Amino acid sequence: MNIVILLLILTFSIKHSNTYKLKNTYIPINYMYHNNKNILRSQKSKLFLNFLSNNQLANSNKQTCFFKSNIKSSISNIDNYDYIRKRYINTSNKNKLFYNITLRTNDGEKKIECNEDEYILDASERQNVELPYSCRGGSCSTCAAKLVEGEVDNDDQSYLDEEQIKKKYILLCTCYPKSDCVIETHKEDELHDM
């Protein structure tokens, strides 16, 4: 029943979506990301992506779904994996890996826990730590921060250039932790003064 509802929602949600060529027809694929609060953002999205990858997508070396706010997730039925980063969506907390993040904010140090598949900005909001943001898609500098210690995956962003990345600037709205981290927040002005 839930899959049928999801398919109906997808069929009727044709507004401003990126499209995919599915067996010689184009259909929109809207934002799908896990969150137990609503069906479009539930784990059912993962089931639908598997359905698309196994049954509907035209043959190609690379198929990537682009969702709202530039969030991307790769579909698993692909011949060439060299350029693909997979995101597995799972709402279960069993054996879930998380990292301790120390945020050096304008109001002092804040410590949060961030799941390995969760953006640092989302984790901070979940734990009532307010940080600046605008686009939530890695295409502006409002949530700019600087990585002091640790390692992150900031590949989902599209704003920072190579020089800024080498100087350890990150965008918290599209940044996954890969280890425990220390991060200085509120770095938008510093970023633009470079």
From Swiss-Prot:
Its cofactor is [2Fe-2S] cluster. Residues 99-189 form the 2Fe-2S ferredoxin-type domain. It is found in: Plastid, Apicoplast. Belongs to the 2Fe2S plant-type ferredoxin family. [2Fe-2S] cluster binds at C135, C140, C143, C173. GO terms for biological process: electron transport chain. Ferredoxins are iron-sulfur proteins that transfer electrons in a wide variety of metabolic reactions. By transferring electrons to 4-hydroxy-3-methylbut-2-enyl diphosphate reductase LytB/IspH, plays a role in the terminal step of the DOXP/MEP pathway for isoprenoid precursor biosynthesis. GO terms for molecular function: 2 iron, 2 sulfur cluster binding; electron transfer activity; metal ion binding. The gene is FD. Pfam families: Fer2. Binds 1 2Fe-2S cluster. SUPFAM superfamilies: 2Fe-2S ferredoxin-like (SSF54292). It comes from Plasmodium falciparum (isolate 3D7). The keyword Metal-binding applies. Residues 1-19 form a transit peptide. NCBIfam families: fdx_plant. It comes from the Eukaryota. One of its GO terms (cellular component) is apicoplast. Keywords: 2Fe-2S, Apicoplast, Electron transport, Iron, Iron-sulfur, Metal-binding, Plastid, Transit peptide, Transport. This is Ferredoxin, apicoplast.
